[in-house]
Amino acid sequence: MPEVTARGIRFHVQTMDPPPADPARGAASDPPVVVFVHGLVVDDLSSFYYTLAGPVSAAGARAVLYDLRGHGRSERTPAGYSAADAVADLFGVLDALGHRRPVYLVANSFGGVVALNAALARPERVAGLVMIESYGPAERAGEWTENMLNTLGKSALVLEYERLADQLLAIGWRQRGRQARTADALVNGTSLLDDLAAIEPVRPADLAAVTCPVLAVYGEHSDIVDAGRLLLRSVPECTLHIMSGHAHTVLREGTEQLLAVMLRWLAHHAGTRVPVMAMAGGAL
């Protein structure tokens, strides 16, 4: 299991290198780095590993995936789940891997909070953002956290008092049981919920200070699609792609269309190749 230690914490990391450079094509010997930042609690780097990371690597980028603090196989600490901690963890992992030049961040759901705050805190280290159904931007405090915290609070009660992990393991659902046990330890055994409640949204005035290009991809029926529209209005260089017929599960259920849009955007901004499937995906 590949690991790095950053800020005194063990992080599970996976890296996918691009194919060898082809001198005849003039391919870059130092490929762009694309870092994937996943969502909360039951999510981990595997959600990208089996969807986006492989094709991004095949297109000529170095894909870096890591489990957020307390998630997946990364170390679970009692505290340290604020946005500032997550940003510091991100750059700590990149430093440990030796990636100090600007990188592209691909973020899903809560990962958008990390990516957006990273771009504002260290603009010299972020070359671009891909925000997939991402939380973070909002007009008012509490606008984006209320529903998420209510959902996590209810999940915490089910995990603790109904012993969901034990029930799943008892009927032979080992993977889901292990995920539930990890989620239980995270939401009921750390400061995660309190830290999330204290996170402030990134408001329009701050979004205007985002200097890198942004691709925002949201589902037509998503309950946070307004975050994508806010990004479009407020970020100086933003492309918004609304996926018709989809809700918050764009990454899992709309992978092919998402890849086509994202790979074409990366080709334009990062200089990666455009696979045939992406060229057939239509204009942004």
Describe the function of each predicted region:
Residues 140-146, 155-209:
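Conserved alpha/beta-hydrolase catalytic His-Asp/Glu region
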Residues 12, 16-73:
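Conserved HGGG/HGGXW glycine-rich cap/lid loop of the alpha/beta-hydrolase fold
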